[in-house]
Amino acid sequence: MADTKLTDQQVADLNTILRSDSPLDAKVQYVTIIKSGIKQHNVPESSVAQLFEGLRAATTSQHAALVNAGFTALNHLLTRLSRQDPKLLSKEAARTLPLVVDKLGDQKDKFRSLASHSLVTLFSVAPADVEKYVRNTAMVGKNPRAKETSMHWLLQMHNENGLPFRTYVPVLMELLEDADGMVRDAAKNTVIELFRSAPNAAKSDLKRQLKTFKVRPAIEQAIVKELIPTSSRPETPAAPAEPTPEPAPRKTFSASTSSAAERPITPGIDTKPEVLEPLYVNTNRELDDMIKEMAWFFEGKETEHNWLKRENSVHKLRRLIAGNVTDFSDTFLAGVKSILDGIIKVITSLRTSLCKEGCGLIQEIAYTFGPAMDPLIEQLMQCFVKLSAGTKKISSQLANVTVNTILSQVTYTPRLMQHIWFACQDKNVAPRTYATEWLKTILKKEGHHKHHLEHTGGVDIVEKCLKKGLADANPAVREKTRSTFWVFWGIWPAKADAIMADLDGTAQKLLNKDPSNPNSAKAAESVARPGLGLSKSTMGTSKPSSIREAMMAQRKANAAKNLPARPGSAMAQLSPEKITTTTSSASSKSSGARSRPETGGMSGAPMRPSRKRPEMAARPATAGPYSVRDMDPGSPESVRSKTPKPRETTPKRTVPRTRPGHASHASESSLASPSSVRTGQKSAASPRASPTKLKQSQSTMLSMSSPSRADEDFTMLVPSMANFRTSQRPAPPPQRAASVPPEAPEELSTLVTEIAPQNIPQAAAEPTSQPTLEPELEPQPEPEATPTPVVDPVAEAVDQTMDETVKPEEPVHIIPEPVIEPTPEPSASMQADQAPAASAPTLQVYEDPFTDEQTNSKPTFNLPVLEDKPVNADTASLPSVHAQSPVTQNIEAPDRAKQSLRLLESGIKRIKAKTLDVHGFRKLQSLLRDSKGIFADDKFEALLIGLFQYLEDPLSGTSPEKAQDIKAQILATIRLLLKKERDNFQPHVSRGLESLLETRSAYDIRAHIVSGVEVLADELVTIGDGSEIVVVLTRRLQNVDSSTTEGSRILSTGMHVLRTMLDKRPNFMPTGTELGQLAALAGRCLASADSGVRMDAVQLCVALHSRVGEQTFWDALKDVQDDPKSLITYYIVKRQREQAPTIAA
């Protein structure tokens, strides 16, 4: 029956069955048969009304099964009639629409979808009725699901059929403030999508509607931010932060010169560009209304009621400049001119914040519009020259910066020079000082076309300004003018020589000695490196130092004479005291003798009397004191190559940190004395010190934190947990520890140990970085006490540098600190026998990289705070890690390796499933950084391929910000693998570059992940096979369409990678086939419509020309048109000229 056409009798029987008491299953089955007939054949026209009536009755039934069958059949009937005879459908639309609109709010998604589809069908025959029901019934009803579905239908109809939505805007504004959060979100998304492609006038009207209906600010800002108008102009980069010319460097004074008599220099204003949230306008009328609205706030005098409105108005103008106001530049500049008097009131306000906003606005107008603001210059220059003469330092400096910005951006006129001349004659020092900088800005800007100055009388004014400045009563003005004079001399040397000839002998001498003098041979030698102190390592001259340095040298010599003889103990009886100076960057850091000797203790600090040391062989008298020992240990080449050089910073005076309360009860030797805690002071190297072998971890820390006098320019590192953790880690057997010097990064107890000679392997004889003064003697056996370390999982990432100094096969042991009690001292042989047994309570701590549960246990102490400290009496009872044999040390290594392998496999699985989040990647990086030898070839390849696939995935189900963060961690993990497994990485370079190209295509140049992609690509090309990279990339870029945004990004990045490979690999020479592929790629991209792709193609051609030579290059590019060839030739010549000075040097 289902395959036959419906008859009138069947339709009549449908109504009879639905009204009867027949079983539900029979009704559902009959409706289903009717539905099949509708789907297969046309409906008899005479029965259409009865069929609609029956199916509407089934749809409104109380039984879900019958409703399902009836509503689906009704949807098929609507579709059938829209094709068979739309007139029949239009007659039933009025009676069917209420039922369909009611189903828009059904609980089941299926029915809501069917209702939306039915509305689309009915809209084709009765559009007015459908819109009326949707707008006046569904959208304003009480059912939130109906509201959401109706908005989705509206968006669908607009996108597919171009439905005008203007009449829906008031209803959508009401829905933006609906009580239901889901409705508000749907309304917000609907408004954004509807207006995204709307004209600018409609977007401007939308902003007014949002204000009129008082939509909450968060929703309003989200909508406006999404509807940023499209601009034909590329986004303007941030204004440069150096409008002020660099002042001339100060004359080099000796270290003894005191500046106490001079006036303290007020810190300069912050020139860091302020980050402004862009504000966008859509039409000229909107911009004009906005400026007219704020004009009222600038009327009259500044009061408590209007100053904040003025500040907000100026800030809004700055936001407009950061937005798209350049698309309406005429309207904006006309508006600014109309309120210029008000802006000047803001600039001259006594409120600093208001003045700063005004100056910032003028600077940004100058940077953005340049000569277009010429009509405003006269009033502004008068205002700022007057403001620069004020007594308020911040306002004066702001005026100086703003005038410099204006002069560097606007068109030169003779009036500008007149303003500078007036400033040179001002009675205040500040304008006269600033005028020299303004004059220098004019000279540098107009020096290339000096006829502007010559034909308008500007040169005469410049000469008058220079003469007046060189004869000024203030020395600062004279000094600034000398620098400006030499800029003038570079343009008009004859006139400058005439000015110099009129000066007296002293003034001429000072002028010739000025650092800006290009004729001075010593100009470059006498300038100290900026940012460092006046020590001998930072000064450029080799002349004798000042009187103060001579006094310090004399004190050092006297202290060396007064040192007592070296005792037989393992330490010096006293340590030279650090002499601090009043200047943080003193030129000399010498040490003087302490006034009294101390006995006992292993540092220079005063100590309580300690117990008698156990009977053992005396330390050789030739050993130098710990406090002045050379702290540069010799390290294997492999360790040096993997440990990055610590960053050099300026020595600064730091506040002494509080001393941790009894961090270790085993020894007090490393606690620094109060006199030695001051940073930036170096102890003098003892002439009797012999080179010693330090702990690997401690020696690394000490060599960075306490350099010798020979390396005085290395300054103190910032204390970090990484250094502390390293100092607590057990050291390898071949090295002997020293006490922590006064400048250790953390003031925590660190034990001093000496290893028995029989435990030192032969491979430990590494040369130290300092010359050997005396032959190395065998150290005496001394037990070691290990304090409880503080485990900090957060410091794992920071601790990479220090971790690499530990032997790879040695696990980190954490030993609980026992309660110290006096015990009889055993012999050395007994200690050696007891060492393995004492290590029984050793606990290995592992970290799961993919769990968040990390616990840090703090050590507890049962001893009083103040007590006598037994230095070495009870060390035999403590376990000694280094007394273990190599076999004992590696017992637990397999277990840890297995656990690391399991964690790695778990990470690989999650990476393949693309479920590993940012935190998981950081844990994985920590595992890869700390584990050694966990990679098999298959594991490495699986992890790397999984990372590449994860990197390429668009992560459509994740928010864009989170997706960027995840991909940034993927890049960091790949770079870590590249660093640790460089050889294994080499076969996967080409695959990695393809993945990076795919990733780059999804992001704009402003995305932060782009820089990471480019850096990784630049590293990969240095290790891959050049020919393979050329073949793979040219094949990948061959069919990429440059007309799309993604294609342009891929082409630009690919050619950048190829150019980088040519630049970084001078030994790579492409073959004829490879050259042809590269030339074909470049030739195709030179004809691209995207300017960035064309530029990268030109750069690639320049690199190819530099590599293959003139004739071969042009033969390969013979099919390229003449215009691109001219451009390529220009850049080739430009590069050759840039390289010429380097080659000549």
Curated annotation (Swiss-Prot):
According to the record, the residues making up region (Disordered) are 226-271, 510-793, 816-839
User: Which InterPro entries is this protein grouped with?
Assistant: ARM-like, ARM-type_fold, CLASP_N_dom, TOG
Question: What is the superkingdom listed in this entry's lineage?
Answer: Eukaryota
Keyword list, A-Z: Cell cycle, Cell division, Cytoplasm, Cytoskeleton, Microtubule, Mitosis, Nucleus, Repeat
GO MF entries: microtubule binding
* Pfam families recorded: CLASP_N
Extract one GO BP annotation from the record: cell division
Q: Name one GO cellular component term.
A: microtubule organizing center
Q: Where are the HEAT repeats?
A: 96-134, 168-206
Q: Where in the cell is it found?
A: Cytoplasm, Cytoskeleton; Nucleus; Cytoplasm, Cytoskeleton, Spindle
Which purpose does this protein serve, as stated in its record?
Microtubule binding protein that promotes the stabilization of dynamic microtubules. Required for mitotic spindle formation.
The identity of this protein, by name, is Protein STU1
Originating species: Gibberella zeae (strain ATCC MYA-4620 / CBS 123657 / FGSC 9075 / NRRL 31084 / PH-1)
Question: Gene that codes for this?
Answer: STU1
